[in-house]
């Protein structure tokens, strides 16, 4: 059924992520990943593709190191959430169960089974998720979202390019955080929602690691062409109004 409390599911996801970042104790973060990430999976299964943000922030913060023992111990805390995600993916809802769910919603809450609930019949398996999207792909959609990502993420891309991460190369950082979005583009038709979630996670994560001084922004950024252009007040105002 649709879980539309507090607006959208992603509001809950973002709130949990902010709570996680506010935790100061590594043990508390371990408990969070073990016991609360499974809850996020039950709220919205694709959140598993954004676990990479947890991993990057934790690595920069020193929650784990790149060695066999530390990495295995850290990844072990994701097993409950990933196990639930795999179980859901490998056990799609049957037509009979879907009908019973729709009847239950109607009789007890007077709600119709629509949107995500309705799509469960045609997009319940992993294969169906990909297959249903193939006919939607065309040049116009690719161009549109390429420009949306380029313009929308442009300032963040510039910041990352001129940033020096304590433990990561910026190219590796970009690769790690952008990989999930391309997988979700192949699986989901609501690309606008994906971009919104991806952008919010990216901004929250970058601001957090900047606040914690895990990244240093070079003064060379002031020499960037786009930064120079936007420093002109009237151009910045026009750009702000348009976008």
Residues covered by each model-derived region:
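Membrane-water interface signatures at transmembrane helix termini and the short loops
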Residues: 2-10, 143-210
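Membrane-interface transmembrane helices that cradle and orient dolichyl/undecaprenyl
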Residues: 18-32, 62-65
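Transmembrane alpha-helices and membrane-interface helical segments
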Residues: 19-26, 54-58, 157-158, 199-220
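Membrane-interfacial loop-to-transmembrane alpha-helix junctions, especially the N-terminal start
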Residues: 29-33, 70-74, 165-176, 194, ...
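Membrane-interface alpha helices of multi-pass inner-membrane proteins
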Residues: 31-56, 182
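Perimembrane helix-loop-helix junctions
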Residues: 50-79
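Membrane-lumen/periplasm interface segments of specific transmembrane helices
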Residues: 70-156
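Signature aromatic-anchored transmembrane alpha helix within multi-pass, membrane-resident enzymes
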Residues: 75-79, 215-243
